[in-house]
Amino acid sequence: MLGRSGYRALPLGDFDRFQQSSFGFLGSQKGCLSPERGGVGTGADVPQSWPSCLCHGLISFLGFLLLLVTFPISGWFALKIVPTYERMIVFRLGRIRTPQGPGMVLLLPFIDSFQRVDLRTRAFNVPPCKLASKDGAVLSVGADVQFRIWDPVLSVMTVKDLNTATRMTAQNAMTKALLKRPLREIQMEKLKISDQLLLEINDVTRAWGLEVDRVELAVEAVLQPPQDSPAGPNLDSTLQQLALHFLGGSMNSMAGGAPSPGPADTVEMVSEVEPPAPQVGARSSPKQPLAEGLLTALQPFLSEALVSQVGACYQFNVVLPSGTQSAYFLDLTTGRGRVGHGVPDGIPDVVVEMAEADLRALLCRELRPLGAYMSGRLKVKGDLAMAMKLEAVLRALK
């Protein structure tokens, strides 16, 4: 791992000498009667004077003698098995010894204490936090970090709580990096930012005996758009057609079905998407809610594969700008799935309550279900894991 990532162990005083400083059950200490060459590093084991070295050897001998006398019984407590993916850090009379393992390790009673160190790759997440970008946008950003310990001695001697220290380091590095960038750069260059965070975090954690293998930046939601950005959202081509289809249909309905004097290309876009459903009730209602148009336009994207993947029935209680609440359903339990106005025929698996603007942001991929739930913009009644499967529905819109 160290050779692949380009990191190497740095000389850190007595820490490097710990690897060769213990032999036999007495654990001979280099520098017992004279100081080590090169001085003593910060936090390292200081050289022993000859009285201290003599007492250390005598007590260790008595501990080993006690182990031999009571071996049939003490063997159950003194022998420890260390698996391949672990190392055991042993402290004898408070002084650190060579990392032990894998295999069977013998500990002396009363004078040895130990701590196991897991060398396998582990992961943690940086909880989503609100950050302000360079252009004034407010966004909720988190990160997933994978790391492993390459020096068990350093991981025990330098930091008390390694997980918390690494998480705080990753969060601070992420905050500093995102404050210097505008929102568009954060969204378009997440991989580049993640690689930069990887290097910055490793610059700090490699002195702790820890190496970060991967950092994945996750933008949960954009809570506030940039101050100097245009009002219109950036949509992909499919969602632009979906929005133009509904908005164009609403304008024609308000005009009583008469041709709109607007641009011809907008009229053509509406006519291309809308022919399969000329009898939709939206034409008879001059003030059709935006949520109804967006939800019913999901029907062409539903499929049997999506039904088998999700397999749930959702009820959406959408709060309209007027303050009233309207109910819609998305049934992905049978056939190709259904979507429409009103409550479902059976009992829904999940009831989702949100504002109409948040629903629009959700369908336009400006807001993710998890980010909306954590920020309080989406309220869920029922199985939360089932509600998070709405992400599969949003992916079907691509």
Curated annotation (Swiss-Prot):
> What's this chain's function?
May play a role in cholesterol transfer to late endosomes. May play a role in modulating membrane acid-sensing ion channels. Can specifically inhibit proton-gated current of ASIC1 isoform 1. Can increase inactivation speed of ASIC3. May be involved in regulation of proton sensing in dorsal root ganglions. May play a role in protecting FBXW7 isoform 3 from degradation.
* SUPFAM superfamilies noted in UniProt: Band 7/SPFH domain (SSF117892), SCP-like (SSF55718)
Q: Which residues cross the membrane?
A: 58-78
Please list which residues make up the signal peptide.
Answer: none
User: Which membrane topology term applies here?
Assistant: Single-pass type III membrane protein
Organism, scientific name:
Homo sapiens
A Pfam entry, by short name: SCP2
Give the GO biological process terms: lipid transport
Q: What is this protein called?
A: Stomatin-like protein 1
Cellular compartments annotated? Membrane; Late endosome membrane; Membrane raft; Cell membrane
Q: In which tissues is it expressed?
A: Ubiquitously expressed at low levels. Expression is highest in brain.
GO cellular component annotations of the record: intracellular membrane-bounded organelle; late endosome membrane; membrane raft; plasma membrane
Family listed: Belongs to the band 7/mec-2 family.
Topological domains on the Cytoplasmic side lie at 79-398
